Amino acid sequence: MDTKIGSIDDCKPTNGDVCSPTNGTVATIHNSVPSSAITINYCDATLGRHLARRLVQAGVTDVFSVPGDFNLTLLDHLMAEPDLNLIGCCNELNAGYAADGYARSRGVGACVVTFTVGGLSVLNAIAGAYSENLPLICIVGGPNSNDYGTNRILHHTIGLPDFSQELRCFQTVTCYQAVVNNLDDAHEQIDKAISTALKESKPVYISVSCNLAAIPHHTFSRDPVPFSLAPRLSNKMGLEAAVEATLEFLNKAVKPVMVGGPKLRVAKACDAFVELADASGYALAMMPSAKGFVPEHHPHFIGTYWGAVSTPFCSEIVESADAYIFAGPIFNDYSSVGYSLLLKKEKAIVVQPDRITVANGPTFGCILMSDFFRELSKRVKRNETAYENYHRIFVPEGKPLKCESREPLRVNTMFQHIQKMLSSETAVIAETGDSWFNCQKLKLPKGCGYEFQMQYGSIGWSVGATLGYAQASPEKRVLAFIGDGSFQVTVQDISTMLRNGQKTIIFLINNGGYTIEVEIHDGPYNVIKNWNYTGLVDAIHNGEGNCWTAKVRYEEELVEAITTATTEKKDCLCFIEVILHKDDTSKELLEWGSRVSAANSRPPNPQ
C-alpha cells in the first residue's frame, strides 16, 4: 500500500499573482492610482511614506503593529498615509496572526514590529503564513544605519555586535529578505520585496533602519509605478501532452473522483477545478484544509475526504475509486491521519500548481493548474458513476437528540444550532483542536467563508486570525470557535477587536484542557487552570466599546445567547462561553488522535 502520493511538495510556489481568499474568489492587487493623478511633495517623499504608499498599492489598507523604539518614527510615517490604517496589537505574535487572517481574506497582509525582540516574537506567525502560502509583508524597525559594520553592542540583541541573528532566523520562513540601511537602494529593495511576496505568495521580511524612515530622497518623489506581475504561462506542448495522458488514464476508469487540496488557492485554480467538476460529472470531495474553496452546494459534492475521519460515506467512495484526481494536495501526518490513507499511487493523478503527475507515469512540468483543468474540462468524458454510487449508499445524518431541560449541553447539539447561523454574510474561523473536526461537519452556504490553519497547527492562531480576517472583511460576521487552552495563549487581542469596533461572535469551548493533545497522548500537563472567561473579557472590555458576554451550560441557554447575539447585540463583539464535559469530543477526534499517536510512537528504524 503506497500512501505517499502527492508528497513531493518541496517546489517553490508557482502562482503569478496574489493569493486568492477563501471560497476561491479572486483577490486582485489594488491598481495604483494613475501617475498623472498623483503629486508627491518632497517633504512627503520619505522612506516611511514611500513604504506606506507601496503597501496601499499592493492591497494593504490595515497594518498590524506593536511599537518599539526602533520602529516609532516609521510608525509615524505609516500613520501619515491617509489610505493606511495602523492597528496596534497587544503582542507581536498576535500581530503576525492578524496579518495572516487579513491575507486570507484580502489577499495580502502586513505587520510592523521592532528589532529582534519583536522580530523573533512574530517569527512563529510568519512561519505559519509560509506554510499556508500567504503573501505577508513583515516589516521590522532596525538599528541605526551608522551601527552596521561597527563593533557596537545594541539593546534588543543577544549581546553580540553581529546584527544578523534576526535576519538569519527569517531566511528560512520568508521567500525574500530586504535589509534597508541606506537610502540609495531603499526604493528598489522595498519594491522587490513586496512584488516577490505577491508573486510567490509567501511572506517577506523588510528591515528599515530607524534613522532612515523620516528622510526624504529623490527616488521616493517619482511618480509611482504600478506593481506589474507578469502572468506565468503554461508550456503549450507540455500542457497538450499532460491533457492527453490524463484523458487516456481517466477514460479507462470506471468510477473516477476528484479531490481538492489546499494548494488550489495559491494556484488560483478554484474556479477551473469547479469547471472540471461540472464537465466531468465526477464525485467531488475536498481535503480538510481546502474546505470552503469550492461551493458545497455543488450537485456532486460528497464532503470532506480525511481518511478514517472523513464525512460519512466520502472515504468509501474516494478510496474505492479506480482513478482519483488530487488537486494541490498536501499529504502530511495530520491530513493523512497518521499516514493511514488507503490510496494507491498507480490510481492517482496529482496536480500541483506547476506540474502534473499521472499515476506511475511521467511528470509534466511548467503547466499551470488552472490551464490544465480548463483544457481537461473541454475534452473529458462525462462519468457520474462514483457520484451515483455515493447517492446509493448515502444515508442522511440523524439529528442529535434534543437535550432535556437543564441537561448539560453536548457538543453535537451545539453545532446543530451553529449550522443555522451560517449564511453568505458569515465566515467561520476554527482553532486547532476539536473545533477542526466539528467545524468540518458544517455545511457551508454559498459565500460563507471558512479558514483554519492545518499545516502549521499553532494553538492560539485563531484569536489573531479572527482579528485580521474581520478587519479585512467588515461585511462578514466572523464566527470563531476557540478552545480554552488555545484562548489562554493569545487572549490579549480581544482588546484590539474592541478598539476597532469588530462584531465577531466568539464561541469559547470550555472543556478544561488541551483536548486534542489528550486524544493523542494524555497526561496531567493537558489539564489547565480554569478561568472566569466571561469575567476576563468583561474586564478587557472595561466599559469601552461594544461587548456582550454570556456563559451557557444548557441547550436553552445556548439558543437564547445565539438569538441575543444575532439580534439586539448584532453590532457588538459577542463572547459566548460554552461549558462542555471534558470528554465530550467528536468521534472523529477520537479516531484521528489514536492514529496520529500511533504514527508518533513508531519505534526507530533498525540501524
Curated annotation (Swiss-Prot):
Q: Where is this region: Thiamine pyrophosphate binding?
A: 434-516
Query: Which Pfam family, any one of them, does this sequence belong to?
Result: TPP_enzyme_M
BP-aspect Gene Ontology terms: cellular response to hypoxia; response to anoxia
* EC assignment: 4.1.1.1
Tissue-level expression reads: Highly expressed in seeds, and at lower levels in roots and siliques.
Q: Which cofactor does it need?
A: a metal cation; thiamine diphosphate
Q: Record's Gene Ontology CC terms?
A: plasma membrane
What InterPro entries has UniProt attached to this entry? DHS-like_NAD/FAD-binding_dom (IPR029035), PDC/IPDC-like (IPR012110), THDP-binding (IPR029061), Thiamin_PyroP_enz_cen_dom (IPR012000), Thiamin_PyroP_enz_TPP-bd_dom (IPR012001), TPP-bd_CS (IPR000399), TPP_enzyme_TPP-bd (IPR011766), TPP_PDC_IPDC (IPR047214)
Query: What reaction does this enzyme carry out catalytically?
Result: a 2-oxocarboxylate + H(+) = an aldehyde + CO2
Main EC class the enzyme belongs to = lyase
What does the induction field say?
By anoxia and abscisic acid (ABA).
What remark does the entry make about the cofactor?
Binds 1 metal ion per subunit.
Give one GO term, molecular function aspect: thiamine pyrophosphate binding
Q: Which UniProt keywords apply?
A: Decarboxylase, Lyase, Magnesium, Metal-binding, Pyruvate, Stress response, Thiamine pyrophosphate
Q: Report residues binding substrate.
A: 69, 156, 517
Q: Which residues bind Mg(2+)?
A: 484, 511, 513
Highest taxon in the source lineage: Eukaryota
Describe the inactivation phenotype. No visible phenotype under normal growth conditions, but mutant plant roots are more sensitive to anoxia.
Q: Belongs to which family?
A: Belongs to the TPP enzyme family.
Q: How does it assemble?
A: Homotetramer.
What's this protein's name?
Pyruvate decarboxylase 1
- Per the UniProt record, the source organism is Arabidopsis thaliana
The record lists the lineage as:
Eukaryota, Viridiplantae, Streptophyta, Embryophyta, Tracheophyta
